[in-house]
Curated annotation (Swiss-Prot):
EC number: 3.1.-.-
Protein name (record): Probable endonuclease C19F8.04c
Tagged with keyword Metal-binding: yes
Source species: Schizosaccharomyces pombe (strain 972 / ATCC 24843) (Fission yeast)
Source species taxonomy: Eukaryota, Fungi, Dikarya, Ascomycota, Taphrinomycotina
One GO cellular component term: mitochondrion
C-alpha cells in the first residue's frame, strides 16, 4: 500500500516538474517582445548564417512610415496562439504606444520622405505606397539582424502574397526590381535573406530599364547622398 502511494506521488511530482519545465520553455519561446529595447541579443542573426538557422519573429504591421521602415507588433505563435481571433492587436495609437518595434528594411535604401523642412525625393511617395500596399495591416515574418543608431531593428522582411498560406517573399528585392529602392551601400549594411550580390543584379536590370527612380538619369540623387544634405 505504502509503495503504491509512493509511486503515485512520484508520478504526480514528475508530472508537475515536467509541466513546469515545459511551461517555462513555452513562455520563453512565445514571449511577446514589445519594443526594440527589449529584444534579446540572441535574437539578432548574423547575416551570413544559413537560411534554415535564422531566428525569426512573426507579427503584424501597424503603420508604414516611408519606403523602407514600418512599425511591427510582435504576435508570437500567430493565429495558432489566438492572435486576431482570441487575442486582438490594438488599433489606437495610444494603445500601441511603446508596444511596437520600429523596423528598418535590411539591404535597401528607398527615396527619402519630406522631413526637417526638406522636400521629399522623387518616387518617395511611390515607394511608400508600394510598401504600404504589401505590408500594412498584414502579418509578416522578420529576420532580426541588428539595432541601428536610431534604435530601429534592421531586419529582413518576408510577407505573404496569399494571406494565411506558408509561401512568403522577401520584400526588399521586390522594391529593387521595380526601381523603388537602391541597394544599401553603407559600410554598416546587412543583407538577409537575399544576398547583396542578388540585389545588385536586380538593380542593374531596373537601371537598364530606367524604372521609377532610374528614369531620372543624371538628375538622380541617391538616398544616401540626399541624407547627407539633410
Amino acid at each position: 500500500m505504502q509503495e503504491s502511494q509512493y509511486k503515485e506521488k512520484a508520478i504526480i511530482g514528475t508530472g508537475l516538474i515536467t509541466t513546469s519545465i515545459g511551461g517555462f520553455f513555452f513562455l520563453r519561446r512565445f514571449r511577446r517582445i514589445s519594443n526594440a529595447s527589449t529584444i534579446p541579443k540572441n535574437y539578432l542573426n548574423n547575416s551570413t548564417v544559413e537560411n534554415r538557422k535564422y531566428k525569426t519573429m512573426f507579427g503584424y504591421v501597424t503603420r508604414v512610415g516611408d519606403g523602407d521602415n514600418f512599425r511591427f507588433y510582435h504576435t508570437p505563435g500567430g493565429r495558432l496562439l489566438g492572435w486576431h481571433w482570441l487575442r486582438k492587436v490594438p488599433c489606437s495609437r495610444s494603445d500601441l504606444s511603446n508596444e511596437t518595434i520600429s523596423v528598418r528594411l535590411a539591404g535597401i535604401d528607398a527615396p527619402e520622405s519630406a522631413h526637417f523642412g526638406k522636400q521629399e525625393q522623387p518616387y518617395a511617395l511611390e515607394a511608400k505606397e508600394f510598401l504600404h500596399n504589401k505590408l500594412y495591416h498584414k502579418s509578416v515574418r522578420i529576420i532580426p539582424l541588428k539595432i541601428d543608431r536610431y534604435a530601429r531593428l534592421v531586419a529582413g522582411v518576408q510577407y505573404y502574397p496569399i494571406p494565411h498560406f506558408f509561401w512568403k517573399k522577401d520584400i526588399g528585392p521586390q522594391m529593387i526590381r521595380k526601381g523603388l529602392a537602391v541597394v544599401y551601400e553603407g559600410s554598416d549594411g546587412v543583407f538577409c535573406p537575399t544576398k547583396k550580390e542578388c540585389l545588385l543584379a536586380l538593380e542593374i536590370v531596373a537601371k537598364k530599364k530606367k524604372l521609377s527612380l532610374w528614369s531620372q538619369g543624371k538628375k538622380l540623387i541617391l538616398p544616401s547622398v540626399y541624407k547627407r544634405g539633410v
